[in-house]
Structures are given as structure tokens and as C-alpha cells.
Amino acid sequence: MSTKKRRVLKIIILGDSGVGKTSLMNQYVQKKFTKEYKATIGADFLTKEIEVDDKKVTMQIWDTAGQERFQSLGSAFYRGADCCMLVFDVNNAKSFDDLDNWRDEFIIQAGPSDPDNFPFVVLGNKIDEVGVNRQVTEKKAKAWCASKGSIPYFETSAKEDINVEAAFTCITRNALRNEKEEELFVPDAVDMNTSATQRKRGGCC
């Protein structure tokens, strides 16, 4: 079996149930969106191969359940994460308030060596539904990100495919920028026979 030199990045998406984590992942990887809501049980992942700044990257994107009873997935799930997406619904204030808990949970479970410089990115999702019901302003979200060390922030819509690719490209660049200069060798053919078909933070681009 031949091998090809490429980087493998493990991306974990965290946030409350119903904020659109699965939809964002499906839109980015498969370019599809469904209105039907089906809660993720435990965790699931998809992979996507891309090229960023002349570097070949295999993104292993992990989508997690937002329900409390699944928050105890443990360090085994978080271990080896190269970057983390924190997602909230701009029309749901509680999902924004819970970002602190999700960020703390990740840092505790993943145990990054340098939490202050670990590559996070925050997505304010469902901007296609914005109207009188919007509860979290862009200014408020950016202020929270600034208070955590200038985390990049994107307003997204999985449904309309707004800023989805930009957000994933940003976090990939930051992960590559922060990773140690190690080369990972991965077999060309890896068939997970599941729904599977993506390392650290900083300014984007």
C-alpha cells in the first residue's frame, strides 16, 4: 500500500444542541443542507481533503452532541484535537452564554499545552433567520472573542452557505501555523465504513 505525506487535523465542533453543528459540517464537507433536525447521539465525524497554502490537509471534523448527558464523552474524545470550533445560534442567547462552559470543557478535557494560544474559532450561526428575534449582536460576540485572546469570529448560515468555507479555512490555517513541524504519514485508503467520508488559533489569513 502506498503512502502519501499529508497533514491530518482533528477539528472538534462544540456548542449547545440545535445550534447547527451538524448542518455546518454537512454544508462544508458535502455541500448539502436539510431542514430536518436530528439530534447527534454521542459524536460523529466526516473527513475532507483540501489544500491550504500549498499544504495537503486531511480534515477530520468531529460533530458532538450538545445535550448535557453527552458532555461526559471524556478526554478520549477530545484527545489529539488540533483546533476547536465553538458554535452558537445568534437567535438564542443561552447558546451564546454557554460558550464559556464549552471552551472550559474543551480545555479541561483536551489539555492543550498552551490554552491561551490554542486555535479556537467562534461561529454565530443561523444569520439567515435574523430578524426581530436576534438575541446576540455581532458586537457582543466579537467582544467575547476579544476577551478570550482575539478568537476569530464568523457570522454563518449553514442553510445559505454563508462564511462556512471561510471559517473552516481560517481555523485550518491557524492550526497549521501552530502545529509542530511534524510530518504525519497516512495510508491513501482509509475506509471507516461509517458516515466518515479534519491543530491551534491566531489571526486568520
UniProtKB/Swiss-Prot annotation:
Protein transport. Probably involved in vesicular traffic. GTP binds at residues 15-22, 63-67, 125-128. A motif (Effector region) lies at residues 37-45. It is a lipid-anchor. GO terms for biological process: protein transport. It is found in: Cell membrane. One of its GO terms (cellular component) is vacuolar membrane. SMART domains: RAB, RAN, RAS, RHO. Its main location: membrane. InterPro entries: P-loop_NTPase, Small_GTP-bd, Small_GTPase. Belongs to the small GTPase superfamily. Rab family. It comes from the Eukaryota. Disulfide bonds: none annotated. PROSITE patterns: RAB. One of its GO terms (molecular function) is GTPase activity. This is GTP-binding protein yptV5. Keywords: Cell membrane, GTP-binding, Lipoprotein, Membrane, Nucleotide-binding, Prenylation, Protein transport, Transport. A lipid is attached at residues 204-205 (S-geranylgeranyl cysteine).
